[in-house]
Amino acid sequence: MNTTLITGASSGIGEVFARKLAARGRNVLLVARSEEKLVTLCNELGRSNSIRAQYVALDLSKPEAPAQLFAEATKRGLTVDMLINNAGFGSMDDFSKLDLARELNMIDLNIKSLVELTHRFLQPMIARKQGAIINVASTAAFQPVPYMATYAATKAFVLSFSEALWEENRAYGIKVLALCPGVTDTNFFEAARGHKPPARVSQTPEEVVDTALRGLAQGKSHIISGWTNFLMTQSERLAPRSLITRVAGRMMRSQQKDSK
């Protein structure tokens, strides 16, 4: 059974991916930690769209979790022809003040889990010569971000990794896309440190997902969601990195002050 696997699917961008793809008639396998939210969402999607919506409640930051997820999808007889690696989180403060265990946990989820899931599900796609992978990066991938140092570094990895795989797998008929949203109206900032996103530059998750699906259909290696975000990332490539880093630091300090 052809299925789209979506991680971080219980809310935000992941939930919107699930809703929009189910509306297109795609079966979905949703993954997140909250079983209660997954059950509710799967029941709703199945009733509303006449598709098969399944879930696996799992903490993908755990070392054994990606292998467990692959084994479970195989056990259920699912053909995962689209993988959306959306699970991830960030933190916001001076790096020296942040909890080290949480920073390392972020690396496990944002990078290690994403790499393992991509590797495991990519191999069957290559054998079938068909498939698609969307890895959710960020506009933070394009420059250092003081006060979100680890998070931005993980997203820089995701962008570089995804673009390399885009080239490696074109000959197999497999699409790989790095989705780079900017500030989005989700609970990301609250989870990072109780901050609210600045509304003046926020996009909705629906806008971000529409951008991703358009970019995937066009065969792009990466896509930046939002015209303002696109212009910002282009200017960052032209200016000296030291200047960009200082400007980013000022913006983050202002964001921390305004959202307290």
Which residues make up each language-model segment?
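Conserved glycine-rich Rossmann-like NAD(P)H-binding loop of the short-chain dehydrogenase/reductase
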Residues: 24-41
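The beta1-alpha1 cofactor-binding region of Rossmann-like NAD(H)/NADP(H)-dependent oxidoreductases
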Residues: 35-36, 56-68, 100
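Conserved glycine-rich cofactor-binding loop
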Residues: 10-11
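Substrate-binding pocket helix/loop in short-chain dehydrogenase/reductase
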Residues: 94-96, 102-107
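SDR active-site lid
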Residues: 166-231, 242
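Residue(s) in the substrate-gating loop at a strand-loop-helix junction
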Residues: 138
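Active-site helix of classical SDR
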Residues: 118, 154
